[in-house]
Every structure is written in structure tokens, then in C-alpha cells.
Design a protein with these regions (language model features):
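The conserved 3'-phosphoadenosine-5'-phosphosulfate
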Residues: 7-12, 126-198
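Non-catalytic N-terminal targeting/anchoring module and adjacent flexible stem/linker
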Residues: 198-204
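Loop/turn-to-beta-strand initiation segments
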Residues: 39-43, 66
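Generic, ordered loop/turn and secondary-structure boundary motif
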Residues: 2-5, 43, 92, 145
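Residues that form generic nucleotide/phosphate-binding pockets
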Residues: 27-35, 58, 82, 114, ...
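PAPS-dependent sulfotransferase catalytic domain
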Residues: 47-162
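Short, basic, helix/turn surface patches
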Residues: 30, 97-104, 167, 192-195
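PAPS-dependent sulfotransferase catalytic core
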Residues: 1-37, 173, 177-180
Length: 204
């Protein structure tokens, strides 16, 4: 766990994480204040279900906050990324190194538990999100990589598009999802039995 500030400064000390968790809403308010002080047009943060319930409740209570909701149809790819990040504690891959090609060690049962959990999250969140009056938009993961996505997102936010906009992240593993696992054979069998063999193929 790492606290990342508006200026991308990182602090994974016990004191920083405890301070955030002790007062999550005050921490969030400070983030927005720092963002405003830097003079940026829009400031935001990545929030995942399970991060903090008080923040989730705050999002629903503040209609001025814009919500960009991302979900992923390929649950196998999603779980592969989750397990790899959890095992290595590397939650954001920003450079190419050995971590990119490292295989995931997981069984079909472990994957089944996780993907059903995340499918349930998405189902419940979509229902939670629908009645909110916040400005909001939903994208499926693959849409983020389509030509013109940055322009479309900027249009939604009402800000000028800059051609230099680019995510600092690099892809963590093979685009062919079954190649991400140390032992793909039982996983391949399992998902073909479920009629979800397409999850094993190229995602992008």
C-alpha cells in the first residue's frame, strides 16, 4: 500500500498509510486541495471497490464528483493481473523488466473464487451507480485502447485534448491470456468447460 499525492510523490511508510486510513475523507480533501493548488484543470484518483467504504459513500453523497467507471469483460485476464500484483506487491507497472514476463501461479479453483467475486462487484456497482446524479460514464477495459479514446474522454470532461497524453503504465503480461499462467492446461480445460474459452485468447 502506498500513498500517492497530487504531485505523484509516493510514501509507503506506516505513518502515511495509517494517517490515510484513520481519516480517509480528510485525506481525500487534502488531495483535492493539493490538486487545485497546482492549477490543474481536473484532478482525480483511482478507486477500487474494497479500498474504503467511507470514500465510496462520500462519492455517492457529492454530486459534483465525476465518476469514470471501468469494468472488464475478461475476468480471467482481470484475475491474472490481480493475483500477479498481489503476489509481487507491484500494483502499477511503469517500466519493462523481468516482472512483465513472470508467470502467474494459480489453480482453477482460486481463479473461480476471484472472478465470481469481481463479477459480483461489477453487478452491484452498476446498480449503485445508475441512480446517482453525478456526471458519470462507463467504459469496458478494451475501449481504453481504441484510437481516439483520450479525445473522447477529454470531450466528456470538457477539457482540451493534448496529444502528449499517455498512461505511464506498461502491459504486465502476454496479450494471450492463457500464456500468463505457469500451468495453463487445467485452466484451459476449466474455462472451455464453462463455455468461456474466449477468455484464454488475445484480449486486445
Amino acid at each position: 500500500y502506498t500513498v500517492i499525492g497530487a504531485g505523484k510523490e509516493r510514501d509507503d511508510s506506516h505513518e502515511a498509510v495509517l494517517g490515510r486510513d484513520r481519516q480517509p475523507l480528510a485525506h481525500l480533501q487534502k488531495f483535492y486541495e493539493q490538486t487545485e493548488a497546482r492549477g490543474v484543470a481536473w484532478g482525480g484518483f483511482k478507486f477500487m471497490i474494497g479500498h474504503n467504504l467511507k470514500v465510496l459513500q462520500m462519492l455517492a453523497a457529492d454530486p459534483d464528483i465525476t465518476i469514470i467507471y471501468i469494468w472488464r469483460e475478461n475476468r480471467l485476464a482481470q484475475v491474472a493481473s490481480l493475483i500477479k500484483a498481489s503476489d509481487t506487491k507491484n500494483w502499477a507497472q511503469t517500466r519493462r523488466n523481468d516482472h512483465v514476463t513472470r508467470k502467474v501461479r494459480a489453480t482453477p479453483r482460486q481463479i473461480s473464487h476471484r472472478w465470481h467475486e469481481y463479477a459480483t462487484f461489477d453487478h452491484l456497482v452498476s446498480q449503485w451507480l445508475a441512480p446517482l446524479s453525478n456526471p458519470k460514464v462507463t467504459y469496458e477495459y478494451r475501449e481504453l485502447f481504441q484510437p481516439g479514446f483520450e479525445q473522447k474522454l477529454c470531450d466528456f470532461l470538457g477539457i482540451s485534448y493534448d496529444k502528449k497524453m499517455k498512461s505511464p503504465l506498461v502491459k504486465q503480461s502476454s496479450n494471450t491470456i492463457e500464456e500468463r499462467f505457469e500451468e495453463p492446461a487445467p485452466i484451459r480445460y476449466y474455462f472451455h468447460q464453462l463455455g468461456l474459452g474466449h477468455w484464454l485468447e488475445d484480449e486486445l
